[in-house]
From Swiss-Prot:
PANTHER family: ATP SYNTHASE DELTA/EPSILON CHAIN, ATP SYNTHASE EPSILON CHAIN, CHLOROPLASTIC. Keywords: ATP synthesis, CF(1), Chloroplast, Hydrogen ion transport, Ion transport, Membrane, Plastid, Thylakoid, Transport. This is ATP synthase epsilon chain, chloroplastic. Belongs to the ATPase epsilon chain family. It is found in: Plastid, Chloroplast thylakoid membrane. It comes from Cucumis sativus. Pfam families: ATP-synt_DE, ATP-synt_DE_N. The gene is atpE. It is a peripheral membrane protein. One of its GO terms (cellular component) is chloroplast thylakoid membrane.
Length: 136
């Protein structure tokens, strides 16, 4: 038995196929989803989506930039602001973006700049973690 996983952004479909299981980062922590999972709707945090295509496969990773997920009837629909498969992320560009985000956080002045810099840093870290394959 499998799950039908769809990952959608406002501009494109990132993923639309069957998978064996996923691990999703929600605002209240990670959840594992297998076939016949109880129905749930949840907020998705900035973080890594782990996808296993078959029981013997390793994990594929994807960087998610926050949104919502609906799980039920062996279908998982994830609607996010943005998402990138690890295989689509340029490692050098991601590392450069992370370094810029860290520098921007160090020089942030005031509450608003600090909040924006922290958010940019979380996004940049997530992209780098997706490439490096977060340990399961």
């Amino acid at each position: 038995m499998t799950l039908n996983l769809s990952v959608l952004t406002p501009n494109r479909i990132i993923w639309d196929s069957e998978v064996k299981e996923i691990i999703l980062v929600t605002n209240s922590g990670q959840i594992g989803v297998l076939p016949d999972h109880a129905p749930i709707a949840t907020a998705v945090d900035i973080g890594i989506l782990k996808i296993r295509l078959t029981p013997n496969d390793g994990w594929l990773t994807m960087a998610l930039m926050g949104g919502f997920a609906r799980i039920g009837n062996n279908e998982v629909t994830i609607l996010v602001n943005d998402a990138e498969k690890a295989s689509d992320i340029d490692p050098q560009e991601a590392q450069q973006t992370l370094e810029i985000a860290e520098a921007n956080l160090r020089k942030a002045q005031g509450k608003r700049q600090t909040i924006e810099a922290n958010l940019a840093l979380r996004r940049a870290r997530t992209r780098v973690e997706a490439i490096n394959g977060v340990p399961s």
